[in-house]
């Protein structure tokens, strides 16, 4: 019996690994995928959703669910830690303090807007509002995946949040080059190759989408946009730490309330299980190590390649365990919320960029 369970667990791991490799092969073989803003992570989850929703494979997938769940949870955390090898603290200096200030302002305003509208206006589940806010404010699917273990959201909510990032991030790819032409006409006095790069990097959802949108403008805009985007990505670690501490605080409040009512047993378990996620802390540590340049370049490149594979496998696992019927239940409200947040990124984020640039030049 144990040998059979071990085989099924291993089979689940192998299935996710094969799906991850397939996603990597597709994105490397077909350039139009990345040029269209469909990143490796997006392709991986789409493959997983396709496989997981095939009726004749449902019973087989259920046999391997232990390995699939392990990939979606544990392998994902390892992938997030290794994601730090793509970043360095020196990136901040390359764009300057202005870019950092704009990034922080856009991040805080976007996430706050998503939470407020999602919960207060659209009456969405708190976890879904947080996931949409994190994906829009930080770095798309990677941020949503990293936030999921903290909020312990259901698979369907994660997929709904990721779908909003894909939809409106793809729209960004075509909208921003048009915006650039209009901006040059109305604000001819501003250094646009640099400033518009900061604008794209601080407001577009995914790294791949930033590249696609910025490359449509110019190489200089693309360079600045990517560095600015990387600074946004670096906010992921602190964000996860703060978010987890918020949940700890919430659990403590529940513990006090239930203790006063004479029933606090279950909340103690909840408090113990809501500790600060180790992967968020290690994510920052890895960025620090990468910033020191201690590892050879070849080793860093290998670790980045491994990380791409791990994240792709985790995304495939997420897709496999997601079913269309559950996504339909979410309705149109998440899409409306994401649309408003997207409009804020385009116009509100643009206003933040203009105000910050003008004040900086005084």
What is each stretch, according to the model?
Residues 15-21, 44-48, 70-84, 106, ...:
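Small-residue-rich segments of transmembrane alpha-helices in multi-pass membrane proteins
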Residues 117-123, 172-199, 231-261, 354-362:
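Juxtamembrane and boundary regions of transmembrane helices in multi-pass small-molecule transporters
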Residues 124-172, 192-218, 306:
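Alpha-helical membrane segments and immediately flanking helix-loop junctions
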Residues 2-70, 83-91, 238-307, 316-326, ...:
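Structural signature of multi-pass alpha-helical membrane transport proteins
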Residues 34-50, 73, 95-109, 133-136, ...:
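Structural signature of hydrophobic alpha-helical transmembrane segments
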């Amino acid at each position: 019996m144990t040998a059979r369970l071990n085989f099924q667990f291993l089979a689940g791991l192998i299935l996710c690994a094969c799906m991850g490799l397939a996603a990597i092969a597709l994105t490397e073989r077909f350039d139009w995928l990345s040029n269209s803003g469909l990143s490796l992570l997006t392709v991986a989850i789409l493959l997983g959703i396709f496989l997981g929703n095939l009726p004749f494979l449902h019973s087989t997938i259920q046999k391997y669910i232990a390995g699939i769940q392990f990939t979606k949870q544990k392998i994902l955390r390892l992938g997030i830690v290794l994601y730090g090898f793509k970043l360095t603290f020196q990136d901040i200096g390359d764009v300057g303090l202005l870019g950092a200030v704009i990034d922080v302002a856009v991040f805080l305003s976007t996430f706050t807007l998503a939470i407020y509208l999602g919960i207060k206006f659209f009456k969405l589940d708190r976890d879904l509002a947080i996931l949409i806010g994190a994906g829009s404010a930080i770095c798309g699917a990677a941020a949503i995946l990293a936030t999921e273990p903290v909020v312990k959201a259901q698979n369907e909510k994660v997929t709904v949040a990721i779908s909003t990032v894909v939809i409106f991030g793809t729209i960004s790819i075509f909208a921003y080059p048009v915006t650039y032409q209009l901006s040059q006409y109305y604000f001819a006095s501003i250094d646009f190759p640099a400033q518009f790069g900061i604008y794209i990097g601080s407001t577009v959802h995914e790294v791949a989408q930033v590249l696609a949108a910025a490359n449509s403008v110019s190489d200089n805009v693309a360079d600045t946009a990517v560095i600015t985007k990387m600074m946004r990505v670096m906010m992921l670690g602190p964000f996860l730490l703060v978010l987890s501490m918020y949940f700890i605080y919430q659990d403590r409040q529940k513990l006090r309330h239930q203790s006063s009512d004479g029933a606090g047993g279950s909340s103690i378990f909840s408090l113990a299980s809501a500790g600060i996620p180790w992967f968020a802390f290690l994510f920052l540590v890895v960025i620090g190590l990468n910033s020191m340049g201690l590892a050879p370049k070849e080793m860093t490149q290998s670790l980045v390649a491994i990380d791409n594979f791990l994240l792709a496998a985790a995304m495939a696992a997420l897709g496999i365990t997601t079913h269309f019927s559950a996504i339909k239940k979410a309705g149109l409200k998440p899409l409306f919320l994401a649309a408003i947040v997207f409009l804020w990124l385009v116009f509100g984020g643009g206003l933040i960029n203009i105000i910050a640039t003008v004040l900086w030049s005084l």
